[in-house]
Amino acid sequence: MHSIEQTIEVAVPVRTAYNQWTQFEHFPRFMTTVREVDQIKPSLTSWTLAAGPLRGTFQAEIVEQEPDSHLVWRSLDERPGHRGRVSFAPTPAGGTALTVRMEVGPNGPAGLVPGVSEVADRLVARELEHFKEFIEGVGQESGAWRGTIRNGRVRREESERHISGVPSWPHG
């Protein structure tokens, strides 16, 4: 597995950066390699990526998500197999330090072509720059999902639970 770690500071509060990051369907607006993201359910997304003539799709499960803190995912597809974590931390200036850590498997082209690891590092850094330009340019998030996910399951907070015991429709 190849490890990638990139950090960027954005000049918006943690809540704003986190809220925008949870809007996966908006990623094509600022990430050049992301063509489409479908949010199948709160913990499952389908991604279409393209770089030059190369195009691929994969599904990712959100394993853990904590508002204003972090999001952990893993791909459900073998090629290319990967997992990652994005963390959000406040900076002294009131902005956000956003750190992406990924592990990318050797299967697929990354395991066969020399230099692909370095290209992947640069690609993640470039896409984070695009996120920075986007969120600082608009200054506010386009939406938010403030749910918590543990072990791939949405966890309802105590304040959301229906006290009477009568079933209710989930929110979020």
Predicted regions and their residues:
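Residue-level recognition of beta-strand termini and adjacent short loop/turns
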Residues: 41-43, 67, 92
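Short beta-strand segments that buttress and anchor functional surface loops
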Residues: 45-51, 71-77
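Generic structural detector for well-ordered beta-strands
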Residues: 7-11, 38, 48, 61, ...
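Glycine-centered tight beta-turn/hairpin loop motif at sheet-sheet or coil-to-beta transitions
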Residues: 1, 53-55, 79-81
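Intrinsic-disorder/low-complexity, polar/charged segments enriched in Ser/Thr/Lys/Arg/Asp/Glu/Gln
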Residues: 3-7, 44, 57, 70, ...
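Short, surface-exposed linear segments at secondary-structure transitions and domain or protein termini
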Residues: 65-71
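Beta-strand/loop substructures that line and gate deep hydrophobic ligand-binding cavities in soluble
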Residues: 61-63, 74-133, 137, 142-144, ...
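Hydrophobic ligand-binding cavity/cleft-lining segments
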Residues: 1-44, 130, 136, 153-172
